[in-house]
Amino acid sequence: AVSAGLVDLEDYRSLDIVYGEQKATPWPKPVAEPRFRVFPVEFAQAVRNFCLQGGNVFLSGAYIGTDLKDDPERREFAENILKYAWRTDYATRGGAVYTQNALLFGKDLDFNFVTEFHPKIYGAENPDGIEAAKNSGAQTVMRYAENNVSAAVAYNGEEYNTVIMGFPFECIEEREYRDMLMKAILDFFENDQDIRQNTPKDGRKKSSLNN
């Protein structure tokens, strides 16, 4: 709807982009471009304009880095506008996450998202590890507990803010944590508080995969 011009983003202050497990799906025969890409050109342009006009973006999804890492144009958009970069796929098997910014979340949180069969929530088997784009001013605000790979980043800018998660928000198992995280993100967008802090680059546990 946004790409087709049916929704005017100027009517909104913040945008929640839910990509879930969406990724490019090729046709069986080379008759057309792959469908369901993360950030097709028209949508990326609309989000770019939204941010540059002061709009905030909360983005989550399992393939938000993997799906665009080999496309220079979409990668430039992710790094320069949303302020995140792909680091790895298959970033965690168990889905355990911890937060790393008390200024944003109010306190340290440990939670899990679903990666396997669940009767009520689909499993995100192959989430992305994402990190702050180089020289972007963004920072890691969540990590995967099993290896300390960056799981989410936030950008506190002069014109707009972003929070980017490399796993689907809706896959977080406990509603209590979904509520707490969403409230913290919306408060960050609404109040524009400064969340910049000096945090160890390797998180609170040691691993050969630390950034």
Where are these regions (language model features)?
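Phosphate/NTP-binding elements of NTP-utilizing enzymes
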Residues: D128-K134
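Structural motif
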Residues: R13-K23, F58-L59, T162-G166
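Structured segments of extracytoplasmic/periplasmic soluble domains
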Residues: V18, N49-Q53, F188-D192
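Surface-exposed charge patches
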Residues: R48-N49, E131, V153
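Extracellular ligand-binding/catalytic regions of CAZymes and related secreted enzymes
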Residues: N56, K69, E73-V97, K134-N211
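A short, well-structured beta->alpha microelement
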Residues: A1-V7
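Structured loop/turn residues at beta-strand edges in well-structured enzyme cores
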Residues: E10
